[in-house]
Amino acid sequence: MPKTTIIRSLLLALLLIAFLFGVGHLFVLRFQTGDIYPPYSSLRSDPLGTRVLYESLESLANITLERNYRFLHSLKPEPGTTFFYLGASADDYHPVPQELIDVCDRLVNSGGRLVVSFLPLNKTRKKGNKVKKEPESQKAENIECLKASQKNTTASIQEHWGVGFEFNQDLPVEDEGHPPLNAVSQRQGLPPIISWHSNLYFDQLDSTWQVLYTSEGYPVMIERSFGKGSLVLSADSFFISNEALRSERQPQLLALLLGRNAKIIVDESHFG
Protein backbone atom coordinates (compact mmCIF):
# COMPACT_ATOMS: atom_id res chain seq x y z
CA MET A 1 0.00 0.00 0.00
CA PRO A 2 1.46 3.43 -0.95
CA LYS A 3 2.69 5.56 1.94
CA THR A 4 0.36 8.44 1.00
CA THR A 5 -2.66 6.14 1.16
CA ILE A 6 -1.69 4.97 4.64
CA ILE A 7 -1.27 8.57 5.80
CA ARG A 8 -4.65 9.55 4.37
CA SER A 9 -6.31 6.57 6.07
CA LEU A 10 -4.73 7.50 9.40
CA LEU A 11 -5.82 11.13 9.02
CA LEU A 12 -9.37 10.07 8.21
CA ALA A 13 -9.42 7.75 11.22
CA LEU A 14 -8.12 10.54 13.47
CA LEU A 15 -10.72 12.96 12.10
CA LEU A 16 -13.47 10.40 12.70
CA ILE A 17 -12.28 9.80 16.27
CA ALA A 18 -12.11 13.56 16.92
CA PHE A 19 -15.60 14.01 15.49
CA LEU A 20 -17.07 11.22 17.61
CA PHE A 21 -15.31 12.56 20.69
CA GLY A 22 -16.69 16.04 20.00
CA VAL A 23 -20.22 14.73 19.56
CA GLY A 24 -19.94 12.70 22.74
CA HIS A 25 -18.57 15.67 24.68
CA LEU A 26 -21.37 17.89 23.39
CA PHE A 27 -23.95 15.31 24.43
CA VAL A 28 -22.44 15.10 27.92
CA LEU A 29 -22.52 18.89 28.24
CA ARG A 30 -26.13 19.02 27.10
CA PHE A 31 -27.07 16.20 29.46
CA GLN A 32 -25.43 18.03 32.36
CA THR A 33 -27.34 21.27 31.65
CA GLY A 34 -30.50 19.32 30.93
CA ASP A 35 -31.37 21.04 27.66
CA ILE A 36 -31.99 17.66 26.03
CA TYR A 37 -35.22 17.71 28.03
CA PRO A 38 -38.28 19.74 26.98
CA PRO A 39 -38.88 23.27 28.33
CA TYR A 40 -40.07 23.40 31.96
CA SER A 41 -38.83 19.91 32.78
CA SER A 42 -37.54 19.65 36.36
CA LEU A 43 -34.54 17.74 34.98
CA ARG A 44 -33.41 20.77 33.01
CA SER A 45 -30.98 23.21 34.66
CA ASP A 46 -30.70 25.88 31.96
CA PRO A 47 -32.98 28.98 31.99
CA LEU A 48 -35.90 27.09 30.39
CA GLY A 49 -35.99 24.32 32.97
CA THR A 50 -37.54 24.07 36.44
CA ARG A 51 -34.78 22.27 38.31
CA VAL A 52 -34.31 25.27 40.62
CA LEU A 53 -37.93 24.87 41.69
CA TYR A 54 -37.44 21.15 42.30
CA GLU A 55 -34.24 21.62 44.28
CA SER A 56 -35.84 24.42 46.31
CA LEU A 57 -38.71 22.09 47.22
CA GLU A 58 -36.17 19.39 48.05
CA SER A 59 -34.63 21.64 50.70
CA LEU A 60 -37.93 22.15 52.55
CA ALA A 61 -38.37 20.34 55.84
CA ASN A 62 -41.30 17.96 56.35
CA ILE A 63 -41.90 17.70 52.59
CA THR A 64 -41.91 14.46 50.59
CA LEU A 65 -40.90 15.15 46.99
CA GLU A 66 -40.72 12.94 43.92
CA ARG A 67 -40.88 12.98 40.13
CA ASN A 68 -43.51 10.98 38.26
CA TYR A 69 -42.36 9.13 35.13
CA ARG A 70 -45.34 6.77 34.81
CA PHE A 71 -48.30 7.31 32.53
CA LEU A 72 -51.02 9.27 34.26
CA HIS A 73 -53.58 6.50 33.98
CA SER A 74 -51.46 4.42 36.40
CA LEU A 75 -51.15 7.23 38.92
CA LYS A 76 -52.69 6.55 42.33
CA PRO A 77 -52.16 9.76 44.31
CA GLU A 78 -52.15 9.62 48.08
CA PRO A 79 -54.49 11.94 49.98
CA GLY A 80 -53.01 15.38 50.52
CA THR A 81 -50.75 15.50 47.45
CA THR A 82 -49.85 18.55 45.38
CA PHE A 83 -49.27 17.50 41.77
CA PHE A 84 -47.34 19.84 39.45
CA TYR A 85 -48.09 19.44 35.75
CA LEU A 86 -45.81 22.07 34.21
CA GLY A 87 -45.29 23.21 30.64
CA ALA A 88 -48.52 21.71 29.29
CA SER A 89 -49.75 22.53 25.80
CA ALA A 90 -53.11 24.32 25.72
CA ASP A 91 -53.73 22.73 22.33
CA ASP A 92 -54.06 19.33 24.03
CA TYR A 93 -57.01 20.53 26.10
CA HIS A 94 -59.50 20.82 23.22
CA PRO A 95 -60.78 18.26 24.28
CA VAL A 96 -58.89 15.84 26.53
CA PRO A 97 -59.14 12.07 27.04
CA GLN A 98 -61.73 11.14 29.64
CA GLU A 99 -59.19 9.08 31.58
CA LEU A 100 -56.97 12.14 32.03
CA ILE A 101 -59.96 13.94 33.51
CA ASP A 102 -60.60 10.93 35.75
CA VAL A 103 -57.00 10.98 37.05
CA CYS A 104 -57.26 14.67 37.85
CA ASP A 105 -60.58 14.09 39.58
CA ARG A 106 -59.11 11.29 41.72
CA LEU A 107 -56.31 13.60 42.77
CA VAL A 108 -58.45 16.55 43.83
CA ASN A 109 -61.25 14.43 45.28
CA SER A 110 -58.73 12.82 47.64
CA GLY A 111 -57.85 16.25 49.01
CA GLY A 112 -55.03 16.85 46.56
CA ARG A 113 -54.06 20.00 44.71
CA LEU A 114 -53.48 19.99 40.96
CA VAL A 115 -51.32 22.79 39.53
CA VAL A 116 -51.27 23.01 35.73
CA SER A 117 -49.11 25.62 34.00
CA PHE A 118 -49.20 26.03 30.24
CA LEU A 119 -46.45 26.76 27.76
CA PRO A 120 -45.95 30.46 27.02
CA LEU A 121 -47.80 31.23 23.80
CA ASN A 122 -47.60 34.11 21.35
CA LYS A 123 -50.10 33.07 18.72
CA THR A 124 -53.32 34.21 17.15
CA ARG A 125 -56.53 32.57 16.04
CA LYS A 126 -59.97 33.74 15.10
CA LYS A 127 -62.24 33.90 18.09
CA GLY A 128 -64.44 30.83 18.31
CA ASN A 129 -62.16 28.64 16.21
CA LYS A 130 -60.67 25.54 17.74
CA VAL A 131 -57.00 25.60 18.58
CA LYS A 132 -54.97 23.94 15.83
CA LYS A 133 -52.97 20.94 16.91
CA GLU A 134 -49.19 21.28 16.96
CA PRO A 135 -47.24 18.86 14.71
CA GLU A 136 -45.50 17.39 17.77
CA SER A 137 -47.26 17.69 21.11
CA GLN A 138 -45.36 17.94 24.38
CA LYS A 139 -47.43 15.10 25.76
CA ALA A 140 -48.53 13.27 22.63
CA GLU A 141 -47.34 9.85 23.79
CA ASN A 142 -49.19 10.14 27.07
CA ILE A 143 -52.36 11.39 25.41
CA GLU A 144 -52.30 8.67 22.75
CA CYS A 145 -51.91 5.98 25.39
CA LEU A 146 -54.85 7.36 27.32
CA LYS A 147 -56.96 7.66 24.18
CA ALA A 148 -56.30 4.05 23.26
CA SER A 149 -57.22 2.82 26.72
CA GLN A 150 -60.50 4.73 26.63
CA LYS A 151 -61.40 4.00 22.98
CA ASN A 152 -60.90 7.67 22.08
CA THR A 153 -63.51 8.87 24.60
CA THR A 154 -62.87 12.54 25.26
CA ALA A 155 -64.26 15.21 27.55
CA SER A 156 -64.70 18.96 27.35
CA ILE A 157 -62.71 21.07 29.80
CA GLN A 158 -65.39 23.75 29.50
CA GLU A 159 -68.13 21.35 30.53
CA HIS A 160 -66.14 19.55 33.24
CA TRP A 161 -64.03 22.30 34.82
CA GLY A 162 -65.98 25.36 33.72
CA VAL A 163 -63.18 27.12 31.87
CA GLY A 164 -62.12 27.79 28.28
CA PHE A 165 -59.05 29.11 26.46
CA GLU A 166 -58.58 32.18 24.31
CA PHE A 167 -55.79 34.40 22.99
CA ASN A 168 -55.36 38.15 23.42
CA GLN A 169 -55.20 39.48 19.87
CA ASP A 170 -54.64 43.13 20.83
CA LEU A 171 -51.01 42.99 21.92
CA PRO A 172 -48.17 44.84 20.15
CA VAL A 173 -45.95 42.59 18.07
CA GLU A 174 -42.15 42.68 17.97
CA ASP A 175 -39.73 40.77 15.75
CA GLU A 176 -39.80 37.72 18.03
CA GLY A 177 -43.48 37.88 18.96
CA HIS A 178 -45.21 39.78 21.73
CA PRO A 179 -43.10 41.71 24.29
CA PRO A 180 -43.13 40.66 27.95
CA LEU A 181 -46.25 41.69 29.83
CA ASN A 182 -47.19 42.16 33.47
CA ALA A 183 -49.69 40.09 35.40
CA VAL A 184 -51.34 41.86 38.33
CA SER A 185 -53.06 40.52 41.44
CA GLN A 186 -55.44 42.10 43.92
CA ARG A 187 -55.21 39.14 46.28
CA GLN A 188 -53.69 39.86 49.66
CA GLY A 189 -50.42 38.04 50.30
CA LEU A 190 -49.49 37.63 46.63
CA PRO A 191 -46.94 39.73 44.71
CA PRO A 192 -48.94 42.57 43.12
CA ILE A 193 -47.05 42.35 39.80
CA ILE A 194 -45.14 39.54 38.09
CA SER A 195 -43.76 39.37 34.54
CA TRP A 196 -45.84 37.47 31.99
CA HIS A 197 -44.84 35.93 28.67
CA SER A 198 -47.98 34.57 27.05
CA ASN A 199 -51.09 35.89 25.31
CA LEU A 200 -53.09 32.83 26.34
CA TYR A 201 -55.84 33.56 28.85
CA PHE A 202 -58.86 31.83 30.39
CA ASP A 203 -62.43 32.67 29.46
CA GLN A 204 -65.95 31.32 30.01
CA LEU A 205 -65.15 30.91 33.72
CA ASP A 206 -68.01 29.67 35.84
CA SER A 207 -68.67 31.14 39.29
CA THR A 208 -66.50 28.60 41.13
CA TRP A 209 -63.25 30.12 39.85
CA GLN A 210 -61.26 32.77 41.69
CA VAL A 211 -58.95 34.95 39.60
CA LEU A 212 -55.46 35.18 41.08
CA TYR A 213 -53.80 37.19 38.29
CA THR A 214 -54.90 39.12 35.23
CA SER A 215 -52.86 40.40 32.29
CA GLU A 216 -54.22 43.21 30.14
CA GLY A 217 -57.50 42.70 31.98
CA TYR A 218 -57.81 38.98 31.16
CA PRO A 219 -57.64 36.11 33.71
CA VAL A 220 -54.31 34.31 33.40
CA MET A 221 -54.03 32.46 36.73
CA ILE A 222 -57.11 31.00 38.39
CA GLU A 223 -58.01 28.73 41.30
CA ARG A 224 -61.06 26.79 42.41
CA SER A 225 -62.10 24.21 44.98
CA PHE A 226 -62.85 20.83 43.47
CA GLY A 227 -64.25 18.02 45.58
CA LYS A 228 -62.09 17.85 48.70
CA GLY A 229 -59.14 19.42 46.90
CA SER A 230 -58.31 22.29 44.60
CA LEU A 231 -57.20 23.13 41.10
CA VAL A 232 -54.89 25.92 39.88
CA LEU A 233 -54.45 26.82 36.21
CA SER A 234 -51.78 29.21 34.94
CA ALA A 235 -51.62 30.43 31.34
CA ASP A 236 -47.84 30.84 31.56
CA SER A 237 -44.95 28.82 33.02
CA PHE A 238 -42.17 31.42 32.92
CA PHE A 239 -42.55 32.47 36.56
CA ILE A 240 -41.51 28.99 37.75
CA SER A 241 -38.59 28.65 35.32
CA ASN A 242 -34.96 28.61 36.44
CA GLU A 243 -34.48 32.03 34.87
CA ALA A 244 -37.39 33.58 36.75
CA LEU A 245 -36.53 31.97 40.10
CA ARG A 246 -32.99 33.35 39.86
CA SER A 247 -33.94 36.88 38.79
CA GLU A 248 -37.43 37.51 40.19
CA ARG A 249 -38.26 34.85 42.75
CA GLN A 250 -41.77 35.07 44.21
CA PRO A 251 -41.89 32.88 47.36
CA GLN A 252 -45.43 33.96 48.28
CA LEU A 253 -46.76 32.77 44.94
CA LEU A 254 -44.89 29.47 45.17
CA ALA A 255 -46.28 28.94 48.66
CA LEU A 256 -49.80 29.43 47.31
CA LEU A 257 -49.19 26.88 44.55
CA LEU A 258 -47.94 24.30 47.05
CA GLY A 259 -50.92 24.65 49.34
CA ARG A 260 -50.77 22.87 52.69
CA ASN A 261 -49.89 19.41 51.44
CA ALA A 262 -46.79 17.58 52.68
CA LYS A 263 -46.37 15.39 49.57
CA ILE A 264 -45.38 16.94 46.25
CA ILE A 265 -45.15 15.20 42.87
CA VAL A 266 -43.63 16.89 39.83
CA ASP A 267 -44.79 15.19 36.64
CA GLU A 268 -42.27 14.32 33.92
CA SER A 269 -44.35 11.72 32.08
CA HIS A 270 -46.21 14.20 29.87
CA PHE A 271 -42.94 15.30 28.24
CA GLY A 272 -42.73 11.89 26.54
PLM feature segments, named:
Residues 80-125, 137-139, 228:
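Short alpha-beta junction capping motif
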Residues 201-272:
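A glycine-centered loop/beta-turn motif at secondary-structure junctions
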Residues 61-62, 88-94, 209-213:
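Short, flexible loop segments at the rims of nucleotide/cofactor-binding pockets, characterized by
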Residues 58, 108-109, 258:
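Anion (oxyanion) recognition and catalysis
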Residues 49, 53, 99-103, 153, ...:
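Stable alpha-helical elements in mature extracytoplasmic
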Residues 39-44, 89-93, 242-244:
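Second-shell loop/turn segments in exported
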Residues 2-75:
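Aromatic-Pro/Gly-enriched surface loop or interdomain linker
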Residues 120-216:
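An acidic, glycine-rich "communication" segment
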